[in-house]
C-alpha cells in the first residue's frame, strides 16, 4: 500500500494538498485512522471521490475508468480504502515510468502471459518481465494499439461521449 507515515509520505503528497481538498467536498475521505494503516471512512466505490482522484493523480476520467476496468478484468473492484487508492497509484506510476498512457498500459497488460502481469501481488519479477517486454516493444515499430489490434483484434476507438465521472465532476462544480 501507499506509504502513509510522516508529512512527506506518498499519501500526504498525493491527497493532503489544496488541489485535492478543493476537488472534494468530503475532506474526511482522505483522513487516516490514528494508526495510519487505513482510511477513517472506507467505502464500496471510488466514485464519490473521483474528482479528487483525478486531481491527485493528474489523470482524466477516461484513464480512471480504464484503471477500474483493468482491475475488474483481474477480478478486483477498487474500493474507497487504502488498498484501492494504492492500486490506482500503482497503475498511474507504472504508466508514467514506462511513458505510456493508461490505456496503452492496459492493452499491453492484456497481451502478456500471466507470468509477466505487472499487477500480480507480491511478484516484482513479473513486473520486471513486463518492463522488459514493453522496452522491447518500444524499440520496435509497433505501438501498443497496433499490437492489440493485430493480436486481439481490439480497436482503439474511443467514445466521443463524456465519461460518467466527468459529468459528475462538472455537475458538482455548478
Where are these predicted regions, by residue range?
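Hydrophobic/aromatic interaction determinants used to assemble and anchor large protein complexes
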Residues: 1-174
Amino acid at each position: 500500500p501507499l506509504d502513509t507515515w510522516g508529512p512527506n509520505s506518498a499519501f500526504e503528497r498525493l491527497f493532503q494538498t489544496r488541489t485535492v481538498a478543493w476537488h472534494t467536498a468530503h475532506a474526511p475521505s482522505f483522513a487516516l485512522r490514528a494508526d495510519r494503516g487505513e482510511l477513517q471512512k472506507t467505502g464500496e466505490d471510488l466514485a464519490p471521490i473521483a474528482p479528487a482522484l483525478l486531481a491527485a493523480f493528474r489523470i482524466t476520467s477516461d484513464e480512471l475508468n480504464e484503471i477500474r476496468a483493468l482491475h475488474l478484468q483481474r477480478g478486483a473492484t477498487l474500493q474507497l480504502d487504502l488498498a484501492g487508492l494504492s492500486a490506482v497509484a500503482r497503475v498511474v506510476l507504472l504508466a508514467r515510468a514506462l511513458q505510456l498512457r493508461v490505456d496503452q498500459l492496459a492493452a499491453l497488460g492484456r497481451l502478456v502471459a500471466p507470468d509477466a502481469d505487472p499487477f500480480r501481488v507480491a511478484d516484482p519479477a513479473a513486473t520486471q518481465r513486463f518492463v522488459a517486454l514493453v522496452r522491447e516493444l518500444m524499440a520496435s515499430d509497433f505501438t501498443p494499439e497496433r499490437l492489440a489490434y493485430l493480436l486481439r483484434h481490439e480497436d482503439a476507438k474511443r467514445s466521443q461521449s463524456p465519461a460518467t465521472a466527468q459529468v459528475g465532476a462538472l455537475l458538482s462544480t455548478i
